[in-house]
């Protein structure tokens, strides 16, 4: 951090409601600015995770590359965050249950009945269950419907998978078939997201029409 004295820093992190990273970042920013009052630090609670964080990071990068002023970057990121979203499809809820995110009984029933859970990151950064489906095809079709329902038209989509590249590729082609000009790419879930998404899980970050 000594090399950043006097610098302007933008920090984005996983949702503060499910991760301690946001609180840690806020505390670090306050401590740093107390020691270096000339520095500017902006901590953005993503209210999300995984591929939606990638969209936010790329937008910050593009704004800085354009030479936008720091305060304007902060304002624009708060606006942009309102127009990015996260959907997910989970084959297992075991790890979410272990960490108190869902009830163990719900996770057990989902496993026995081969139920996939479709959900989203809410406006306050919590995990909301939208519906439950049987089988992978039904889950992918539902994600496409949810994209449309959440205002997606043709912007960026990032599909992150946990050991399920075939489903991710299939979803990518479905999105491109339904939404002309869709900008879709596939990647893998990172460490923490892989833990919660579990094997077979998908996370979909996307921009709505007003992004």
Over which residues does each language-model region extend?
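Mixed-charge interfacial surface used for oligomerization/domain docking
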Residues: 21, 25-31, 39-42, 48-211
